[in-house]
Regions:
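N-terminal Rossmann-fold NAD(P) dinucleotide-binding loop
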Residues: 171-172
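C-terminal capping/lid region of NAD(P)-dependent oxidoreductase domains
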Residues: 225, 300-304, 316-334
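NAD(P)H dinucleotide-binding glycine-rich loop of Rossmann-like/cofactor-binding domains
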Residues: 87-165
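Residue-level marker of beta-strand positions
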Residues: 64-66, 82, 116, 161, ...
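Adenosine-nucleotide cofactor-binding segment
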Residues: 164, 179-239
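Glycine-rich beta-strand-centered segment in the early N-terminal region that forms part
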Residues: 21-37, 47-92, 108-110, 128-130
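Glycine-rich phosphate-binding loop and adjacent beta-alpha segment
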Residues: 100-102, 181, 192, 198-199, ...
């Protein structure tokens, strides 16, 4: 079968098509024919060497497919079931511990850039019944990250204000989920064309941050001076001064991305004045994923997919991601 492998120390020119032998499932394991995967910044960081990975690692943390064989002792899944991977296969629920955050596919272990995988049955949930494989594959990292920020960590209510930044996978699905919850959304982007699309998805106010350097202050004013209850922070340290300006008293900034840099200064006095919280978010638990899937099914939410590439063109998919031209998610079909 075909798989894409990464030659250490990484780089987009170090992703190669390889032939590997599928492995029969052992006790507690299932074999899954992977139908689709989707790109996340985490995957980009792995393949470019920002996150070191073993030589020969099969990348990609998201996977959706069909169970083709079941090992002894498996009772939760059966042959023919449509399944979706967990980003953290060891994190069942509750607050995370360090061991919960280990074993990430495509990083700590081989991932889903392969036509067939054999893994513990506990590495998969059922797929949303209303989605195809490509759409489902967008949820296990980006979708669950947005869900945890909006629902698990913040417990937003209808009418609350949410600020989303840009038009990447997490930001777009966060906008969709926020509107699904009855929240009001302010969206920022450097592209008027993308802002128009964000508006069509339900963003109430649109800010081109290239034209408005003090976009946080503008967002604060657009709420009538109340401020936003949640900032879905994908930019990281370079954005924090404006994100804090946008924040309501007792609001939360969910830090889920570091596009402006891995480290930087935090205007702590401004955050304290707002009685605000800066909360790091890395995806979510298996219990969170079950709740997210139930909501996606109940509301028939359809993730936004920009482009889909074949497996052999995974490098091209990453180059397109690198160009930042995409709106929503980039998928790979196997």
């Amino acid at each position: 079968m075909h798989a894409m492998k990464l030659t250490a120390p990484g780089g987009l020119d170090q992703i190669h098509l390889a032939e590997i032998e599928p492995r029969e499932p052992g006790f507690g394991e299932i074999q899954v024919e992977i139908k689709a995967t989707s790109l996340n910044f985490h995957d980009y960081a792995v393949v470019t060497g920002l996150i070191p990975a073993d030589d020969g690692r099969i990348p990609m943390s998201d996977g959706a497919g069909v169970v083709t064989a079941v090992g002894e002792g498996v009772t939760t899944l059966a042959e023919g079931d449509r399944v979706l991977s967990y980003f953290f296969p060891n994190w069942a629920g509750g607050r995370p511990t360090l061991p919960d955050l280990l074993g990430v596919p495509g990083d700590h272990i081989d991932g889903f850039a392969a036509q067939t995988v054999t893994m513990p049955a506990t590495a998969f949930s059922r797929m949303p019944a209303n989605l195809d494989f490509e759409a489902a594959s967008t949820l296990s990292c980006a979708g669950l990250t947005a869900w945890r920020a909006l629902v698990v960590e913040t417990a937003l209510k209808p009418g609350d204000w949410v600020l989303v930044q840009g038009s990447g996978g997490v930001s777009v699905v966060a906008l969709q989920m926020a509107r699904m919850m009855g929240c009001r959304v302010i969206a920022t982007s450097s592209s008027d064309a993308k802002l128009e699309r964000l508006g069509a998805l339900g963003a109430e106010h649109l800010i081109n941050y290239k034209n408005h350097a003090n976009w946080g202050e503008q967002a604060f004013e657009l709420t009538g001076g109340a401020g936003v209850d949640l900032v879905v922070e994908v930019g990281g340290p370079g954005n924090l001064p404006q994100s804090i300006s946008a924040l309501a008293v007792d609001g939360c900034i969910s830090l889920i991305g570091v596009l402006t840099g891995w480290a930087g200064e935090v205007p702590t006095a401004a955050l304290m004045t707002k009685n605000g919280r800066l909360s790091g978010i890395t995806v979510g638990s298996q219990a969170d994923q079950a709740n997210m899937i139930a909501a996606v099914e109940a509301h028939d939410m359809q993730p936004v997919i920009d482009k889909t590439y074949p497996l052999a063109e995974l490098t091209d998919a990453f180059r397109y991601q690198e160009s930042q031209q995409h709106f929503g998610k980039i998928c790979v079909s196997l």
